[in-house]
A protein has these predicted regions:
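Catalytic domains that recognize anionic headgroups
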Residues: 1-151
Length: 151
C-alpha cells in the first residue's frame, strides 16, 4: 500500500482511526488525496477486547476446519453464541468508526470529496464460514459505498 503516494504513515496500532484523524492535515491551497485503511472492523474486533473469543493466526476465512478434519485441535471454531458476540462487536466497531468519521468530516475543508467503501465484507457463520476471502460468498461481496462532497 505504500507505493505511489507522496507520503505513507503506518500507525503503531492497526485499529487507530482516531489517531489518523488527529494526524491528518488539510492544505487548502492544493488538492490532496488521502487513503485511510482502517483496522477497527477487522477480526479480532478488538475495540473492546473483554472476553472476545480469539483464534491465533486467523486471517482470511475459515470453515469449521477442526470438525472437517476429524482431529482434535487446540483452537476450536466459534460456537453460535460466540459468533453472535463477534458480530455484535464488529457492529460496535462500525458505530465507533462512524463517530470518528464525524470528526474527520468536521476537520476537512469545505468542498472536500469523500469516498467511503471497503475491500470486503465479512461472514459470521453464513454457510459455516467465518471471515473473508479467498472465497466468493455473498456476505464477503457486500461492501458499503458512500460518496459526496462536504458543503
Amino acid at each position: 500500500l505504500n507505493r505511489h503516494f507522496d507520503d505513507y504513515k503506518l500507525m503503531a496500532n492497526h485499529n487507530d482511526f482516531a489517531g489518523m484523524v488527529k494526524q491528518i492535515e488539510f492544505d487548502k491551497s492544493e488538492p490532496q488525496f488521502y487513503f485511510l485503511n482502517l483496522g477497527e472492523t477487522h477480526y479480532p474486533f478488538m475495540l473492546d477486547p473483554k472476553n472476545m473469543p480469539h483464534i491465533s493466526g486467523v486471517h482470511g476465512v475459515f470453515k469449521r476446519m477442526d470438525d472437517n478434519l476429524g482431529e482434535e485441535t487446540q483452537d476450536k471454531f466459534f460456537d453460535d453464541e460466540q459468533m453472535r458476540d463477534l458480530h455484535k462487536q464488529q457492529i460496535r466497531c462500525v458505530e465507533y468508526i462512524d463517530e470518528v468519521l464525524d470528526d474527520l468530516i468536521a476537520k476537512a475543508p469545505l468542498n472536500t470529496h469523500f469516498v467511503i467503501t471497503a475491500d470486503h465484507g465479512e461472514c459470521f457463520g453464513e454457510g459455516g464460514y467465518f471471515g473473508h476471502g479467498p472465497i466468493v460468498h455473498e456476505k464477503v461481496l457486500e461492501v458499503p459505498f458512500l460518496e459526496g462532497r462536504k458543503r
